[in-house]
From Swiss-Prot:
This protein's UniProt keywords: NADP, Oxidoreductase
Active site as annotated: 174 (thioimidate intermediate)
Catalytic class of the enzyme: oxidoreductase
GO function terms (MF aspect): GMP reductase activity
Provenance organism: Staphylococcus aureus (strain MRSA252)
Chain residues that bind NADP(+): 203-226
Catalytic activity, EC: 1.7.1.7
Catalytic activity: IMP + NH4(+) + NADP(+) = GMP + NADPH + 2 H(+)
Protein name (database record): GMP reductase
Job of this protein: Catalyzes the irreversible NADPH-dependent deamination of GMP to IMP. It functions in the conversion of nucleobase, nucleoside and nucleotide derivatives of G to A nucleotides, and in maintaining the intracellular balance of A and G nucleotides.
Taxon lineage: Bacteria, Bacillati, Bacillota, Bacilli, Bacillales
Family per record: Belongs to the IMPDH/GMPR family. GuaC type 2 subfamily.
Length: 325
């Protein structure tokens, strides 16, 4: 098995067939809807909130609302659908969450997307939740995760998952590898690659994205959608407290399994950091799209499909030029 991560890979260009990168199409059909980009902000409290979720939906971007304000979920679904927008929520696997799914069915509230959001998703509890959702609200598109193995992908798909999230602890504020000894940190892209060999349904690459080029690499190795935390954090519109350190503006960013999220120091697998303020989210999304259009033009195509077949080289400890002083 080849082991590599994002920084080890360079994609090899093909002959360009477009006159301008603006001709390249970055849209993706994911579940019932089509989106402008194959990216989704991480469903974390310092990355996504209700206001941002609405903005993303209005502008044809995919989002997943976090699950850390449980009481707000039903009003959120109603508000989004009454506004003519899609509802995309997260659930856990505790007993109350199974009751919550039944309540949605009773009230005939059908979110277009439901993400089962668990650190170790290759588990009986997640499989049971997938089956429970598919029994009570079969029309919802179910995303399940997270997993790091082909066996995990196969089991969740066989249980009824419509898409699977791949990544165990590769994120910037995740310390699973350090705390437990397990994870895909340091080989996330290779894990995605081997999982894609088993997948019959879409995969979401979750964690380890440090540059826009990593989005193209994720698609090359099997992702339909790419979940991004730190690159989406610390914008003007982002949740999280703004602080000034040494004359510069920063916003807090913490992991879903951190004590800042949990409110207690128990089973902690995440940390908190301050990310330098990045300005407008609109500008970041625009730049992301332009960079992905350039990637497609280098791949010799006109849409995202062209990225799936490009050749690549593994270059350990690449020489950086232009991106490091």
């Amino acid at each position: 098995m080849k082991i590599f991560d994002y920084e080890d890979i360079q994609l090899i260009p093909n002959k360009c067939i477009v006159e301008s990168r603006s001709e390249c199409d970055t849209t993706i059909q994911f579940g019932p809807k089509k989106f402008k980009l194959p990216v989704v902000p991480a469903n974390m409290q310092t990355v996504m909130n209700e206001k941002l979720a609405k903005w993303f939906a209005e502008n044809d971007y995919f989002y997943i609302m976090h699950r850390f304000d449980e009481e707000a979920r039903i009003p959120f679904i109603k508000h989004m659908q009454n506004s003519g927008l899609f509802a995309s929520i997260s659930v856990g696997v505790k007993k109350a969450e199974f009751d919550f799914i039944e309540k949605l069915a009773q009230e005939k509230l059908i979110p277009e997307y439901i993400t089962i959001d668990i650190a170790h998703g290759h588990s009986d509890s997640v499989i049971n939740m997938i089956k429970h959702i598919k029994t009570h609200i079969p029309d919802s598109f179910v995303i399940a995760g997270n997993v790091g193995t082909p066996e995990g992908v196969r089991e969740l798909e066989n249980a009824g998952a419509d898409a699977t999230k791949v990544g165990i602890g590769p994120g910037r504020v995740c310390i699973t590898k350090i705390k437990t000894g397990f994870g895909t940190g340091g080989w996330q892209l290779a894990a995605l690659n081997i999982c894609s060999k088993a997948a019959r349904k879409p995969l979401i690459a979750d964690g380890g994205i440090r540059t826009h080029g990593d989005i193209a690499k994720s698609i090359r190795f099997g992702a339909s959608m790419v979940m991004i935390g730190s690159l989406f954090a610390a914008h003007e519109e982002s949740p999280g407290e703004t602080v000034e350190l040494d004359g510069k503006q920063y916003k807090e960013y913490f992991g879903s399994a951190s004590e800042f999220q949990k409110g207690e120091h128990k089973n902690v697998e995440g940390k908190k950091m301050f990310v330098e303020h990045k300005g407008s989210l609109t500008d970041t999304l625009k730049e992301m799209q332009q960079d992905l259009q350039s990637s497609i033009s280098y791949a010799g195509g006109k849409d995202l499909k062209s990225l799936r077949t490009v050749d690549y080289v593994i270059v350990r400890n690449s020489i950086f030029n232009g991106d490091r002083d």
